[in-house]
């Protein structure tokens, strides 16, 4: 409903329709569904299982390059909390160092808007056609344009791939075997294969962002920092992505609640056996 209303609002602004009919409609009630996420140590198991996932190999690309591609894409999903379209659109020029801190200046995304003759793209987005129904566009909100710090190790592995494959500043770091943009269906296939190889529960790719939001909460990161990393416009949205695990809740509650009982004061109960 929200997406439809946004499109109709824009159509009204561009005078394509006289009025947005959604204004007179009560939004449907949507029951939230809980997103299952991996435990803190399981993403590493998933990434390490990529070479053993048993996926079908297609195209001329070397197996090591294909495996590396998925391992890096999965790591970016967890470590940087990047959206699927942001990871698929990643180019070397977005890799920056600020104050000596390596990171990604998220400036673009890949989205499906249809073939050029059929595409309907919101006026506030700058868009460039890439391939088929895929378009390279600016982020959907101002907050989505953000700098996300990454580890030195991840930074070095990204640049090693860029240099080894001769990827230009404005070329996609991740492509399929034909050099075209990664498709979500292909990533989902390899993701599920890696989950199975690692013996992990079935979770969605999008759950990686929920995992990132949850881990930042577990680390007691300030709300403004959490929303900045996630690219959200409000903390309420970030909280929607956050899942407090039992261990962290127990630790926080243990810090907050003082001891209410002296364990040294033990009452011994006498057990009386009844005889028939």
Model-flagged regions — what are they?
Residues 1-10, 25, 150:
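Non-catalytic DNA-binding core/recognition domains of DNA-processing enzymes
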Residues 9-18, 160-163:
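Arg/Lys-rich amphipathic alpha helix in sigma70-family domain 2
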Residues 13, 17-90, 97-101, 135, ...:
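Basic, Lys/Arg- and aromatic-enriched nucleic-acid-binding interface segment
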Residues 48-56, 60-61, 99, 110-145, ...:
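C-terminal secondary-structure termini that scaffold catalytic or DNA-interacting sites
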Residues 2, 23, 44, 156, ...:
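Surface-exposed alpha-helical interface segments used for non-catalytic interactions
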Residues 15, 36-37, 148, 180, ...:
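Helix-turn-helix-type domain boundary/helix-start signal
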Residues 48-70, 80, 148, 156, ...:
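Short, basic (Lys/Arg/His-rich) helix/loop patches that form interaction surfaces
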Residues 94-103, 201-202, 221-240, 264:
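Short, polar N-cap/turn motifs at the start of nucleic acid-interacting alpha helices
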